[in-house]
Each structure stands twice: as C-alpha cells, then as structure tokens.
C-alpha cells in the first residue's frame, strides 16, 4: 500500500512540476484571453490562442468542430484511456473589468466575471502536463482538449455531444475557477432555453388605445401563469426569465415583445 501511494505521489509531482515550470507562459495566455473578453460564439481570438498554445506543444488540432467556428478538439497520443479535459473561454455581457471598488458603466462591453480566462488556460495547462507524462513515460493513452465555446447560455457543448465528439472518451475532467482549491462530487440541473415572441397591433396608447393589441400583454400574461405554475413544480425546479423586448415608448402600444426563458 505504501509503495502504491509513493508511486502515485511521484507521478503527481512530475505532472505538477510540468505546470509550475511553465507558469509564466500560462499566465500570459490567461491575461490575453482576459483582455479579449469575447462573448459566446464570438471567441475568435481566445480560441485561436488556445489552439496555438496546444499545437506548439505537439497536439493535433481540429477546428470548427460541430460546425462552430470557435470550437475545437486538440489531441495527443494513441490508445486508451482516452482522457478529455474541457476548456471554456467565453465572457459575459455588460461588465467592466476594471478593478475598482464601485460599479462602472460597461458601455455594452463584455467581461470575464466567471473566470473563463483561467478556465480555458488552466485546462490547457493540465492537458499539456498529461501529454508530457504520456510522452516521457512512453505509455499508452490519449489526451484530448475540448475547446468549448458559449458556455454562458449558448449550450456549445450540446452541439459537440450531438456530433459524437465524446463517443470514444473514457473520462471527462472539468473544473471551474473558485476561491478555493478542492475536488468534490456533485450534480447539476439540466437546462432548456427558449425565446417566446408575441406579435400585436401598434397604436397610440392615449389617442386610440382601443385599436391596439399589446404584444407586451401576452408576455406579462405568460409570465404570470408561469409564476403560478411554480407552486406545482418540484423544489429543485428552476425557472428564470427576462423580458428582452417590451416596446420602445410607454405611449405606444407595442406590436412586438419577447421574453427569454431558462428552465
């Protein structure tokens, strides 16, 4: 038992040292992705940088997988086990990245509030470290880095799964930036997204309201009924919505309205 633990610790130390020796390089990659701050399905620079980083380490890179320009799979090695490491690199909308103790106007820009600049980079570092171990030890095994775009509401991985890109994977490893370094078992809720669009008839809200048919009324009626539905769902159910289009002026009956749902 002691010998087995010693061997495992030695393997761990070799892999960890591989990452530590390249710390400054990975820090530079993370900082660049931070500066790009690209939203889902628009991560052109971030995706290209991660592909370049992995390619320079001997990975073969297949880009544009699942018909998504910013999705890719980088592979090294052969045979089993096939280890997948997932990387994300999309930012969130409407966020400032300046480190100040007060809220700044984001001016419709995006920011890395969820730490995906670290997510994508550290996953690449882990994949490279495993690659080095496979190479140096001359052992069988395949390491695959999955460049997964649009995690923040875009369901990028769903399309990759549908394309069968994970069909040969034995184990998939995933992580997320947090305020502590730990590992734990857990579960997540499934998520369905949908946009509901309502169409009506525009009219002046003061001069001739009787001629209007408010699309916004349809959105509000739907939201009210959904809120009443909450009483009859299980405790683990989550339903969220935001009105994305509700009209342009209060004195005009809106002929179009839209609500965006997560459930």
Task: Give each language-model segment a name.
Residues 72, 255-263:
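A generic structural motif
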Residues 35-37, 147, 263:
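Short glycine-centered, acidic/aromatic-flanked micro-motifs in structured strand/loop junctions
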Residues 33, 160, 261:
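Residue-level signal for inorganic ion chemistry
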Residues 1-11:
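Bacterial Sec-dependent N-terminal signal peptides
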Residues 85, 194-196, 259-261:
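Short beta-strand motif preference
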